[in-house]
Amino acid sequence: MAINLKEVKFAYNTPKKKIAPKFILNDINLHIDSQDEFITLIGQSGAGKSTLVQLLNGLLLTNYGEVVVFDKTLSNNKKIKLKDTRKRVGLVFQFPEAQLFDETVLKDVSFGPKNFGLDNPVELAREALSVVGIDESLYETNPFNLSGGQMRRVAIAGALAINPDILILDEPTVGLDPKGKEELMNVLVDLQNKTNKTIIMISHDMDIVARFAKRVIVMNKG
């Protein structure tokens, strides 16, 4: 079992004495395998979906309940090392501009492999960009000059370049036209068919959920 959550709660506020914390997540129990799962996470805005997926790669930490990712317990313990967890569980944010930062597409996607000390980071970046369908003619382009759909693909390539076991995407199709949605979902399906990686995707698009999800998790007020 790659990910195991047991009675997990999460609150953004730091409670003062005699003031109970306001929990965004309440008693979450969840088990996720590292291979061949295509999970969609659905629920109304504010249900805690984005908070939950950020717990899965250690971007957020909690002391309420137990979060175990690849046999490592993630908590607010300052001594815990999260680098390996974040390599194994890749996270792509809803808005790619929050993830992109470098002056060219190739440099941006190469950053992750370099940061994790992987061999041949530029080649890994090229392979990831090819997987998501970014043409080589765009490699030296500033990522912020790309279309919204292209930016999202580059952000996904940045996560894929470190070869995570699990890929998490927060609303990857939001803002895309029907053709763009179809193309992106085909990329993800093809990726899973070739690699057996588990993909976890937040979505409000019920058509996408019905067509592509192998497993659906519904959240309601945490």
Identify the meaning behind each predicted range.
Residues 203-204:
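H-loop/switch region of ABC-family ATPase nucleotide-binding domains
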Residues 120-137:
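Conserved ABC ATPase "signature" region
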Residues 163:
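Conserved catalytic motifs of ABC-family nucleotide-binding domains
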Residues 65-76, 85:
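Conserved ABC transporter NBD signature motif
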Residues 57:
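Helix-to-loop junction immediately C-terminal to a conserved catalytic motif
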Residues 142-146, 150:
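Conserved ABC ATPase signature
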